[in-house]
Regions:
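N-terminal glycine-rich flavin-associated loop
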Residues: 79-98, 121-123
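Amphipathic, small/basic residue-rich leader segments at the start of a protein or domain
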Residues: 1-82, 101, 105
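A short, Trp-centered hydrophobic/proline-enriched beta-strand micro-motif
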Residues: 109-118
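Cytochrome P450 C-terminal beta-domain/meander region
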Residues: 123-139
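A generic, well-ordered mixed alpha/beta core segment in the N-terminal half of proteins
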Residues: 94-110
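Glycine-rich beta->alpha junctions and the first turn(s) of the following alpha-helix
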Residues: 3-7, 12, 179-270
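A short core secondary-structure module
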Residues: 135, 139-178
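Structural signature of FAD isoalloxazine-binding scaffolds in flavoprotein oxidoreductases
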Residues: 59-71, 123-126, 195, 201
Length: 270
């Protein structure tokens, strides 16, 4: 986050600091505690920051979200992933029927979404689709779908014949949608690899204008990168603070560990 913050951002930072200290750090790391974290987040107005105003959210700016995420992660507290409500992602601004069938249930917590962009290195061609009447027939693979194993639908980039790359809602319970592999990454998040074999999808599941899906997907990727960067900075702040306190403590000689030149050299390199 910037070194100079407005009065409103300073207040937001203090709200997040208090929430992390008084609530999150006192909760056990079990699934049942997520609801407590979520309810307190709603009371403080944090939960709605990622949601559109038309759905009761506050639609916070990227700077506000960066301040909040970095501050929360600087405490290394549990359940940070439960603080903010679901965001519309690539579904932002969609009309009917997707607004009722997928966007509203997503923002209400009734459905879970995932994002399908990355293709396997050995894929013969990108995930493709062909419109047949009112149906879009999709074939292909997505190798890295974050949260895909638990998702109700995937917002997938599909190259539609004669139209170009488009974002398409693919419900995971459709015939031909298969999870080929589940795996996790260093940050604890889980992912899945999917294959699509002659999946019949209503053409109304195309998000926005056909052929204009890549810019929409890249905006989603950009927002996600900002999220990861803010969280990483927050966790690094926690590491530096933890290390600083450790170096202030006494070793067996009774002197602070940080008094040794070699220790200070390593600390400065960090």
């Amino acid at each position: 986050m910037p070194e100079t913050l407005s009065k409103e951002l300073i207040e937001l930072k203090e709200t997040c600091n208090t929430f992390a200290r008084d609530t999150l750090l006192n909760l056990p790391e079990d699934p049942d505690s997520r609801e407590t974290a979520r309810n307190e987040s709603k009371r403080l107005g944090l939960f709605m920051m990622t949601q559109p105003k038309q759905f009761g959210g506050t639609e916070a700016t990227q700077l506000e979200l960066t301040v909040a995420r970095e501050t929360l992660c600087s405490h290394n507290a549990p359940h940070v992933d439960s603080v903010f409500g679901p965001s519309p992602g690539v579904l932002g601004g969609v009309g009917e029927p997707l607004k009722s069938t997928h966007l509203s249930p997503l923002l209400n917590g009734e459905k879970r979404s995932s994002f399908g962009f990355t293709e396997p290195d050995d894929a013969p061609k990108p995930t493709s689709g062909k419109i047949e009447g009112e149906t879009l027939v999709v074939n292909g693979q997505k190798s890295y779908v974050t949260g895909g194993a638990d998702a109700d639908f995937i917002n997938a980039l599909v190259h539609i014949e004669d139209l170009g790359p488009s974002m398409v809602v693919v419900d995971t319970d459709l015939d031909g949608v298969n999870i080929d592999k589940k795996f996790s990454s260093l940050d604890g998040s889980h992912h899945a690899a999917f294959s699509f074999k002659n999946v019949n999808i209503p053409s109304s599941n195309i998000i926005g204008e056909p052929g204009k899906g890549l810019p929409r997907a890249m905006r989603q990727i950009g927002d996600t990168r900002l999220l990861f960067a803010a969280q990483a900075c927050g966790y690094m702040i926690w590491v530096i603070n933890f290390l600083t306190e450790h170096l202030k403590s006494e070793d067996r000689s009774g002197e602070p560990r940080g008094n040794k030149d070699v220790v200070r050299w390593h600390y400065s390199n960090a």
